[in-house]
Amino acid sequence: MIEPLASIFRTNNYDIKPVLATLFKSEHFYDVLNQGCLIKSPVDKVISCLREFGVVFPDSVSQYSDAYAMWNYIRNWLASMNQDPGDPPDVSGWPAYYQAPQFHEIWINSDTLPKRNQFTDTMITNGYTRNGKKIVINAVGFTQTLSNPADPNALIDDALAILYRVPLSVTAKQTIKEQILLTNQTQDYYWTNAWNGYIANPSDQASFNTVNTRLKSLYQYLMNLSEYQLS
């Protein structure tokens, strides 16, 4: 990959854009051997969580004060996980990028792992509120973007395809489905009926609470598993 990309770089008068376009469209970039092999940095974990779930921030132009305050809230979380953007520990950057033999494993220790989980727990439950504006994961809204939310099997598969870089076993997915979406039942219709009931009458608070509670539990559980720490 190095030599062909270098050739593209020279051919395009040292414009980096064609190089990146070629790399991001290459088979090598999507090689399964490159997936799930690194622990996410705090920035990777936090920003990917916000983007994958489509968390909405206040407008940075019309509501810049609230927007900047919420960005700073996120920055504080990153700093607590030992990666404060723009403030590396020294000129070498963060040790996880160069310190052998641990490298990326440095990101997780007895202090940072609980904080990584606390962040996702916070975002899927109460979020963060300032001046009446909130950043929080909309569990129902995210689920509505999936291909077939009424089918608990498809729902879990679609969610995992977005959130995970490594596959879960069939047994693990079945257990998650039965314990969370089916509330310890065994038939899929326990979830299907609940979801369809909400879709038929989205203004009904009881129907919303039923699906929202289960979905929050599902996503919180998935984000607390070790597989979610991998990129």
PLM regions and their residue ranges:
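Flexible, low-complexity segments enriched for small/polar residues
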Residues: 1-12, 18-231
